[in-house]
Amino acid sequence: MGQKVCAHGFRVGPTLIKGWDSVLYAEKHYKTLFIQDLKIRDLINKGFNQAQVSRVLIERPSNKSIIISINAKKPNIIIGRNGSEIDKLKKAIEKMTFLKEVYINIHEVRKFNIDAAIVAQTIALQLEKRVSFRKAMKTAIQASLKQGGQGIRVSCSGRLGGAEIARTEWYIEGRMPLHTLRADIDYSTAEAITTYGVIGVKVWIYKGEYTENKRYN
C-alpha cells in the first residue's frame, strides 16, 4: 500500500505528521473556494517558477479574509524590488477572490536540499539544460544526504538521453520506510520540458521518524 499511494497524502490528518495545504470551512460554496485555491496555486507556481516554490498554504479564517503562506528557495523573486511583485500578486488575488483582506506571508526554505519539491524542480531544470539525468540525480542524492536527509529516492521517466523508447530509471540511498506512518517522508514531482519530450521527475526524502517537535500543519 505504502509503495503505491502518494507519500504525502498517506500521512495527511490531524493526528499524523502532514497537514492540509488548504484550511477552510464552507457548507455551500466549497466547490467555488476549491477552484479558487487551484487558480491561486497555479498563478504562484507558474508566475514565480524561478523562485522554486516548495509549498503554498491557503487559509481562510473567515469569509472576508484569506492568508497565503509561501515557502520558496528564493523569496526575493516573489517580493520583487521594493515589494513590487508581491503587490501585483496581492491585487491579482483580490480580483480573483473578491476579498479585500488578502495577507501573504513568504518564508525562505533554508534546507532546500531536503525539500522534495525544490529537489525535483532543480533536477528538472538541469534536464532542460541538457545535463545528464544520471549526473543530476546523483548530485541531488549526495546534496540531500549531506544536509541531513536519512534517505532519498529519485526517479526519472521518459525519453532519457533522447532514447527512442521511453523508460524509467531510479536511484535510492539510505532508508525509505514508505509503510511506516510515523516516518517523515517528503514527496514531490516535477516535469522537464526537453526537445525529446516531457520527462517526469519524482523525489522521496526521508527525514527521520515523527516526533511532536517536528510536526507541522
UniProtKB/Swiss-Prot annotation:
PROSITE patterns per the UniProt record, alphabetical: KH_TYPE_2, RIBOSOMAL_S3
Gene Ontology CC: cytosolic small ribosomal subunit
Keywords on record: Ribonucleoprotein, Ribosomal protein, RNA-binding, rRNA-binding
GO BP terms, alphabetized: translation
SMART domains per the UniProt record, alphabetical: KH
Annotated TM spans: none
Function summary: Binds the lower part of the 30S subunit head. Binds mRNA in the 70S ribosome, positioning it for translation.
Complexes and interactors: Part of the 30S ribosomal subunit. Forms a tight complex with proteins S10 and S14.
Matching NCBIfam families: rpsC_bact
Name of this chain's protein: Small ribosomal subunit protein uS3
The species this protein was found in: Rickettsia akari (strain Hartford)
